[in-house]
Amino acid sequence: MSVQQGIDLCETYERVAAETGHTPPLWLSFIAGIYDEYLENYVRDNKVDIEGDIVRQAGLAATRKMYQILHDKRYRATIIGGGARHVRHFTEMVGGDQVVTINWKGTADVLLGRDEDVVHRFGNPVPPHVIDELLAKLPDFRRGWETGGISIDEYEDFGPVELFRSMFLKSWRSVLETIKSMR
């Protein structure tokens, strides 16, 4: 979920591929919706003076940056977008050479109900003033955006990763409880 995590994963893959000669598919997950949700929570909890429209571009901006790095450095990875919270987390990814997973409720059902043209939007640049404001006002956006913004030791505790993990574990525990109740 941070640019540095993506780079480190790709560098590790390239090193191991060179050592072993094996190049299995590499999927690099960027979960833009969860990144946005984390930052929106931070803005609310810390009363940060920033427009919601700007915050809502953060996850997709980071994904676009990582995508460009993949192509510039010729990394053999494919982005798999996930964690969609809104339709834009799918529609704004159209046009990139990537894969996106979406939820049925609130995304797929909404898309199927629309009668709209498919528009390639992924190549649209994020306005520089949006990036500048995100960098200036949201420390975890800066950490996730900048090369070297976080170290390997910080990956596990990086805010968006913590949010993703806690949501996953909550759902996993619910599944285990359901299974337990059926036995």
Language-model features: where?
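C-terminal extensions of enzymes
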Residues: 119-183
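Catalytic alpha/beta core domains of metabolic enzymes, predominantly
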Residues: 1-121
